[in-house]
């Protein structure tokens, strides 16, 4: 999959990190994007989450500013989500951008997909 679908305030967005986006994100975060999880016992800050969202919007939503991204994140929260609900989205963004490996599926799921 080249992107993930994301919806806020009934508007659809495509999220993906390219190498260019990852480099810009590293500069904004001041660290490797994986470092935001620390040793696995911390959650990213809202600032980090919005930075990831902003970087991942750049490929398919040309012209989205950081200020626009703040509004998109607010709209997503207003849709009934919580800040911690965004963590799986971050992981999906990282998977499509090649930062982490895709989830491994079991053999029966792969076989079922091939049938369809």
Model-derived regions: residue spans:
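Charged interaction scaffolds used for protein-protein
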Residues: 1-12, 23, 27, 31-42, ...
